[in-house]
Amino acid sequence: MIKIGAHMPISKGFDRVPQDTVNIGGNSFQIFPHNARSWSAKLPSDEAATKFKREMKKHGIDWENAFCHSGYLINLASPKDDIWQKSVELLKKEVEICRKLGIRYLNIHPGSHLGTGEEEGIDRIVRGLNEVLNNTEGVVILLENVSQKGGNIGYKLEQLKKIRDLVDQRDRVAITYDTCHGFDSGYDITKKEGVEALLNEIESLFGLERLKMIHLNDSKYPLGAAKDRHERIGSGFIGEEGFAVFFSFKEIQEVPWILETPGGNEEHAEDIKKVFEIIEKFGIEVD
């Protein structure tokens, strides 16, 4: 069974997310644990957490298919001490929110070194992750591959491996693969050889069991453009045929697919339908 969903709004409460996920044709989801554009975050009440867990059970959503995504302001690679410290403290709070809700996975962008260099940036990320992981429990941090722009760290999977290898609690660090970001950074998933190379790289660097989520996004720009502009499924440069190649791999089918395509719930429902149309159109076998 394909595990698919989208990044869902929490404006009406965490407990609305499971129902809204089912309404768009999904069985998986990603949410922000708080207002993503704020340094402020608070734990949900006991009542809110209980209602959320009840709705998860009611709608049959597996906890392995539920994810949080860290806020936009966090930058563990920042050379600015105040931003780095605020990022660490907010990430700790996000981990606590995930634990309260029962969500096991928290996705983060590693961060931007802001021109100070990859090595220094990775050192700061590792120090930040150690501070977070050594003072929290349970939640697994997912390092997401990012676009090659603005001093970003993580546009190559080797950079994510460097980070994971250096943290104290490697068992609490896994990865997310974003199809737009990867395409933007030169990973061509529109060809069978490209997907095979990607899977081989993930296996050799992390082990495929460490790939916990796929951010399923088309790209507004061509391969290697380094623009980081998501597009709706089938409407960008990856396209229907490209996604058909990607979807045909069993290793890809085993991982939850989360849409971060333009639009809201209505558009995401259409994109989920498009995914299954591609699977049917190209005769892709699905377990």
UniProtKB/Swiss-Prot annotation:
Binding site for Zn(2+) 3: 181, 228, 230
PROSITE patterns: AP_NUCLEASE_F2_1, AP_NUCLEASE_F2_2, AP_NUCLEASE_F2_3, AP_NUCLEASE_F2_4
Alphabetized CDD domains for the sequence: AP2Ec
Positions bound to Zn(2+) 2: 144, 178, 215, 260
Keyword Hydrolase: yes
Keywords: DNA damage, DNA repair, Endonuclease, Hydrolase, Metal-binding, Nuclease, Zinc
Hydrolase listed as a keyword: yes
HAMAP family: Nfo
Protein name: Probable endonuclease 4
Recorded name of the encoding gene: nfo
